[in-house]
Amino acid sequence: MHSSINKRYALELAEENKIAEIAEAGSLWQAMRREVQARADFEPIMATFFHATVLNHDTFEDALSYLLASELDSSVVSSMAIREIMQEAYQAEPAVIRAAEIDIKAIRARDPACNSYSTPFLFYKGFQALQVHRVAHWLWHQERHSLAFFLQSQVNVIYNVDIHPAAQIGCGIMLDHATGVVIGETAVVEDDVSMLHGVTLGGTGKESGDRHPKVRQGVLILSLIHI
């Protein structure tokens, strides 16, 4: 029994070391590509999807912009136009991409149902909704409010997640399941926060000014909590 426990501990320690080793963006991207190639080999019926979303791209940001733009495509703003907006944001504010990378590592570390780095990237709507918000937030600070609101609206329709473009959200965020999450205009969510579905960071009722909650670093908010 002791040898079994020690072996499991060694495997867990190795996984923790692996997370530390992929701190650089390139390492994370290469790890994701290896995972997705293995997925494509194992499930050939999805090979086209895996190639379109990950394997056909040279960089993490290229893949992310393609994936999100494909999800947000509409009859009034094409996926091509949305992708150009995202690439503009990534170029002007590299911290947007860095935050996405940190989010993936946080989800992989905290969510026991997540067994790879590519899983949240490809399949978790909480991760995807948050990355669109990061672009909308950048647009908001460029005074491009209409476009920021459009992205917010699309996220609400597609993912059932409603985050005001002005809301300040840190890195290492996990929106687990994410359905029904609402985050208001003056809310602040610091680094390493986890929240489950149905969480509302709502207003106090004031007509203007600072009126939404401030969630400090490392907090866990359980499902259906309204603050």
Listing of model-derived features with the role each one plays in the protein:
Residues 179:
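Active-site anion/phosphate-binding pocket segments in diverse small-molecule metabolic enzymes
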Residues 1-154:
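Terminal amphipathic alpha-helical/low-complexity segments used for targeting or macromolecular assembly
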Residues 163, 169, 175, 183, ...:
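Hydrophobic face of beta-strands forming the core of extended beta-sheets/solenoids
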